Each structure stands twice: as structure tokens, then as C-alpha cells.
């Protein structure tokens, strides 16, 4: 073994000085510098910092429920009475396989579709929900476009529809308000053109008849408080022009539109507490919370501003004053004396009886025409459509009223506003007077004379006889050559 070690040791020492080197060559394709130049030339987008004061719309992809967002809205979270400032565009982010219903003619844009999907994945279908009920109760037909896709996408919805049947020619501005139904409360929509967008698999939309009279429950409570008569009280909602309302129940999301102005808030939310009352014009009432389809008659009463009946009050006051005077003057009750009637006394008695009968006749007419007076007074003063709502309720009010029909005058006024300037400068005001005196038109000829001292002189005349005489006189006097060239 020792002999083998002698031979192995020098070999190991030599191997330790040997190093193995491996050469690896990497081939790389040459980069052409013109590619970047071509990309910069054909670039069609810019960085977001270059676009200012414009809200960016991004399509969301990880969604389970639709998202409604009113663009440009502000809300007062701390106040009990909150308002949504007017905005005419609604942005909706829709998850896959969730249908959304949009009023026909209100779709602005479909975006948020990238390379993972295509526009062909969005399916559209036109539907007319509650066709016969809306035609009978409201006298109108509303078409809704159903959109559904297997991939997420986003929408932009306008508050005004472009179709004529849905108020496309309306001159009033509209704005959005969003409602979330969680199944605990229902909403009664009183404006037929308010429902713009809705979604929800368990959302129920039905049409019901507006109640004409209040319920027995409400009438009993009013009798206990005011001791009123047994006459049936009206709700003030029913009319032959408008006989129905839309009931929203279940779970889902709704986008309502109300009439107003873009310069300020147009839809307001009012929260009524228990036994709290409010007077509202029924045309401005957009929606109200209810508990089922038969709850409107439990909270709404027609209101008429009362008229003070001066004749009855004066008669009652006079009778009471006479009674008090007789009691004060006569401490002791005096028995009436029997007097033999004369013919004159009989005549006076008959006149008094006729006078009393005439008074009773006019009091009877005044009593039964008081209702006619109040209705005519409220109609002339513009208060004939007021209703009283008793809480607890949530109300949505719109600041303007939409008048249906073609309005050519407003369109003509808008055209005039676009032609004529909206502001006038009061500092620099100049008045021009037009001379209406008749004058006969004349033909004038222009000519130029070249003189060595003055140069070219331009003149206009209707007759060359005078100019020729002056030129000849100058030739005789000065003896200079004057060249005249007509134009």
C-alpha cells in the first residue's frame, strides 16, 4: 500500500493545478433601431396625465353584482334629508350572465370589452313588460332592451330616451337617482317615465290601479282625531288620464329619472317620521315607499285649501252677541205680555217670516255650494292637485313636471337663443338712426387726375361737364399738361 501511495500523491498534486474551461457562445439577433421609431409614429394612445378634468371610465372584470354609478353626483350623508345633484348619465358595470334592462333609446355606449371577449358576446333583446296593464292603466307602452353577456362589460345610459313615445322631444332636463331594493320595503313609482334601468333576478315589476278613496283604517283614525263626518275621502291620485302606478318589489337595483334642471339638484329625498304630515303637489311626487300594492290608500289624502265662510261666522257671532246682551241686561226673566194683534203688526210679522225664509234659503245654498267654491278657488289659485301624506314614509320629489306632447314653441325659442347672443354689453351702447326719406339713386363715375405738384387725386362725379370746364381753365391759366385717365 505504501508503494501505491508514493505513486498516487504526485498525480494528485498535478491534477490540482489543472483547470477545466468550457466555452459557450450565445447567438443574439441584431435589434433594429427603426422598430421604436415605427411604434412612436403609429401610436394611437397617450398617457392619462395628458387628459385632465375628464373622468376615466374603466371596465371592471371581477364582479358578482351590477354596479350603478351616477356620474357627477354628490350626496349629503350626514343630513336626514339627502339629495342627489342632477346628472344625466349613469355608468353601469355588469357581471357576466346577469341580464340588465334599459329603456329603449337610452343606451349611449358599451365599453370595457377587451381581447378576452368581443362585442358579439353581448346579446340584445327587445321586450315590452306589462304590455296590457300599462296600456289600460296608463295609456302608454314602454319598451326595454335586455342586454346579457357571458363576459363582463360596462354601459353608459342617458337619462333621456331618443324615442318619441318615451318623451324624446321633452324640453325638460332629467337626472338619475339609484334605488337598492333589499326585499324589506316596496316602492310605488307614480311617474310613468321614471323607470329607466333595472336589474335583478328576484325583482318584481307590476302595474296596479291607483286607489280613489282612502282605506277604512285611515278614515277611522281621522274620525277619532277630527270628529269628521261619514263622507268618503278621496286620495287625489286617481284620474281618468292616469289610473295606474308601477310597483317595485323583491331584490334588485333600479335607476330612476326625474325632471329637473342641470344647474342644481332636481331629485330630493324626504323621510317622514311616525304621524308626520306633509303637503305635496302630486305631479312632483316621483316615488314613495309602500308595504304591498294596497298601502297607498293608507297614507295619502286629497287636500283642499279651505275657504273662510264669512256669512255663517257673522250670523253666528251676531246671534251669540245678542244672546249675551239679553242675558246681561235682564237679570230676571220677564214673562212675555199678550198683545192683541193689529193689521200693521200682522204685516210686519209676515215680512219678517219672508225675510227669514229667504235667509235660510241662501244659507242652504251656501252650505251645499261650499265644496264647489273650494274646488274652484283651488283650481284658480293652482292648488287643486295637492295631497297630504302621513308618515312613516320615504319620498322622492322631482323639482319639475314633464308635460307630454310636442312643444314647437320651446324648440323655436331654443333656436332663437342659439342665433341671438345671450348677453348684451350695457357699457358701450350705440344707437343708429335709419333715414327713411326717399332718395333717387344716382350713378357716379370715378376718375383720377395726375398733377406734378400734388400727384394722383381721386374724385367721383355724376357729370363730367364741370370737371372738363375746370380742367380747360387750368390749362389756359397755368399752361401745364394735365393727364386725366378714367377708371
UniProtKB/Swiss-Prot annotation:
Protein name, UniProt field: Altered inheritance of mitochondria protein 24, mitochondrial
Family classification: Belongs to the AIM24 family.
Domain of life: Eukaryota
Species the sequence originates in: Candida dubliniensis (strain CD36 / ATCC MYA-646 / CBS 7987 / NCPF 3949 / NRRL Y-17841)
Gene3D superfamilies: Mitochondrial biogenesis AIM24
Presequence positions on this chain: 1-62
Keyword Transit peptide: yes
Lineage: Eukaryota, Fungi, Dikarya, Ascomycota, Saccharomycotina
Gene Ontology terms describing biological process: inner mitochondrial membrane organization
UniProt subcellular location: Mitochondrion
Keyword Mitochondrion: yes
A GO cellular component entry from the record: mitochondrial inner membrane
UniProt keyword terms in alphabetical order: Mitochondrion, Transit peptide
Major location (coarse): mitochondrion
